Amino acid sequence: MLFQLFDHPWPPFPFVSVMILRYSLYAVKGELDMSVSPGRTIRVGLALVLVGSTLSVAAQTATARIVTAANTFLSKLDEKQRQSVLFAFDDEKQRARWSNLPVSMVARAGLGLKDLNADQRAAAMALVSSALSPRGFEKVEQIVEGDELLKTKGGNNPMFGKDLYFISILGKPSERLPWMVQFGGHHLALNITIAGERGVLTPTLTGAQPALYTLDGKTVRPLGQESDKALALLNALDEGQRKQAVLGFQTADLVLGPGQDGKTIQPEGLKATAMNDKQRAMLLDLISEWANIIHESAAGARMAELKADVRETWFAWSGPTTADPGKNITAYYRVQGPHLVIEYAPQKLGGDLSMHVHTMYRDPTNDYGRGLTVK
């Protein structure tokens, strides 16, 4: 039926590919010319449909990749290990069993990396990597490496180190039905829900201590962009906007951190309706530091949702409005919208607020993928 809409036969595949590429580029630019012939107008519309289908195929491919990685990991475990790593998808106790604290202070369930052999451990990290973007996985690695530094520079303190991270799977890995991957330990809690072609990364906690270190001769700031982009946005505000954004009181820690599932908070600060286009673009760029941790297909869908919400999004700041060059800010900030809460909270433990930070990323309407329905 669709092909018969044209006033001539559907062209062979190579021409279709060229046509889709040509007209999808015009569509992305918003340069549709409605004065063209009816056949070509229909082609543009069809190109948009097919471009959307291409994005859907990419998401399906990502899901298949994650499922394959999960099944590969499970195949390398013995029966006792599989019993330890697998939970029911609706296990609320396991969903909420995450924290910013070391595992010696808040126990995790699942399988610890220390209990895996080299092959199993590589498969576990391949599963985590498959669900994340390259930059997202790099952040995870940098957070874990920072914890290893806490161990080695603290006299091999058994509270810290890259062995003390846990992985669990909630539900059965599926390309259609919902299931979850959890990975975390000190300063890290990833809750990744996969439901068909959709992916959800909330709630997720990322933190860093040290927030600045040297590894193999390179300077590493695991959450440096989260600091720098926020300060750049603050500095882009005019005096009146800053007065609204900067709160008149001190916020010292995460408000909606671990143990706060299902709760919310009144938006504060500067609403993005009072920002200009450039400032709103900077706000979205800041948000992307969290939204883009997950794999690209899911991140693209998430950013589209957050862009649609941007005018209803708030930016609030509490604390010093400057930072030393190359170091993180020592102020708390929050970004909040209809489907979003981001918090950035420097920590006093360690003495230098720029060297210890906790961040939180939530979707109050869809944490743990609760808002997803399977088609």
Region annotations inferred by a language model:
Residues 35-45:
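Bacterial N-terminal signal peptides that target proteins for export
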Residues 45-54:
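Bacterial N-terminal signal peptides
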Residues 55-59:
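Sec/Tat signal peptide C-region and signal peptidase I cleavage site
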Residues 60-375:
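A cross-kingdom marker for long, charged
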